Curated annotation (Swiss-Prot):
KW Transferase (keyword) present: yes
Record text on subunit structure and interactions: Homotrimer.
Gene3D superfamilies membership: Hexapeptide repeat proteins, Tetrahydrodipicolinate-N-succinyltransferase, N-terminal domain
PANTHER family: 2,3,4,5-TETRAHYDROPYRIDINE-2,6-DICARBOXYLATE N-ACETYLTRANSFERASE, ACETYLTRANSFERASE
Taxonomy of the source species: Bacteria, Pseudomonadati, Pseudomonadota, Alphaproteobacteria, Hyphomicrobiales
Disulfide bonds: none
One Pfam entry name: THDPS_N_2
Designated name of the protein: 2,3,4,5-tetrahydropyridine-2,6-dicarboxylate N-succinyltransferase
Length: 285
């Protein structure tokens, strides 16, 4: 699809979204065709909700988020088959694997372990491995990435190449508010078990999050070496663990107020060190 075609497609979706109150399951023609085309492009990885430029800036293609939202208005609730014991579900979004045969799986080139769930319009790159996990619509999972057991990749989240999302990790989804960017995990990151990255935060390339690290937009991310406090973004090649900071306030009874949770950057490493050092060794203080 040419840039001109994409521009025309995005304009159709933008216009439809402005008049979304008139879009429903009975809508036919250009609007439905445009949304279906956008979802197919997302599903195949030919377009992404967010794209990284050479300088590290991420640009969000809001029109693709709007296409996903419009699809909820266009598609009726229906039975979704394939559950254990011939059980069914009730939803508006089909499985990515609906109608797939051996040919489609071989062409896609990733591994989908039984009981993983991937919704249509999510893209899974070759050599990725999906353990029993959940990947929501509009998400992007890069080449060679492991999505471990009970991990969740939220709507429109962007996961880079050679990332490891450990067991029970939650990567938040962002469809609304419309102006919000998706949660992003860049290439070669390791996210420890039961950690959560949400609310459009970014974990930059090569970073390691230890087990049980929680990062949202309001979470303080503290560099232990410099004392710098940042929000919403983990710098490249950072090693991060869960910690706490003194609140600096006093309770009514005169006692110091409880410490508050923060994420602590315990060290920063270069690309060479990151590639040669085991995760457990990096996390040791």
């Amino acid at each position: 699809m040419t840039n001109h075609d994409l521009a025309s497609l995005s304009q159709t979706i933008e216009t439809a979204f402005e008049g979304r109150d008139a879009v429903n399951t009975g809508t036919r023609g250009a609007v439905r065709d445009a949304v279906e085309t956008a979802l197919n492009l997302l599903d195949s990885g030919k377009v992404r909700v967010a794209e990284r430029s050479e300088d590290g800036t991420w640009t969000v293609n809001q029109w693709l988020k709007k296409a996903v939202l419009l699809s909820f208005r266009l598609n009726p609730m229906e039975l979704v088959r394939g559950g254990p014991g011939e059980a069914v579900w009730w939803d508006k979004v089909a499985s990515k694997f609906d109608g797939w045969s051996v040919n489609e799986f071989e062409k896609a080139g990733f591994r989908a372990v039984p009981n993983c769930v991937v919704r249509r319009s999510a893209y899974i790159a070759p050599n990725a491995v999906l353990m029993p996990s959940f990947v929501n619509l509009g998400a992007y999972v890069g080449e060679g990435t492991m999505v471990d057991t009970w991990a969740t990749v939220g709507s429109c989240a962007q996961i880079g190449k050679n990332v490891h999302l450990s067991g029970g990790v939650g990567i938040g989804g962002v469809l609304e508010p419309m102006q919000a960017g998706p949660t992003i995990i860049e290439d070669n990151c390791f996210i420890g078990a039961r950690s959560e990255v949400v609310e459009g935060c970014i974990v930059r390339e090569g970073s390691v999050l230890g087990m049980g690290v929680f990062i949202g937009k309001s979470t303080k991310i503290v560099d232990r070496a410099t004392g710098e406090v940042m929000y919403g973004e983990v710098p490249p090649y950072s090693v991060v663990v869960a910690g706490s900071m003194a609140s600096g306030s006093t309770m009514a009874n005169g006692q110091p107020a409880p410490n508050l949770y923060c994420a602590v950057i315990v060290k920063r490493v270069d690309e060479k060190t990151r590639s040669k050092t085991g995760i457990n060794e990096l996390l040791r203080d």
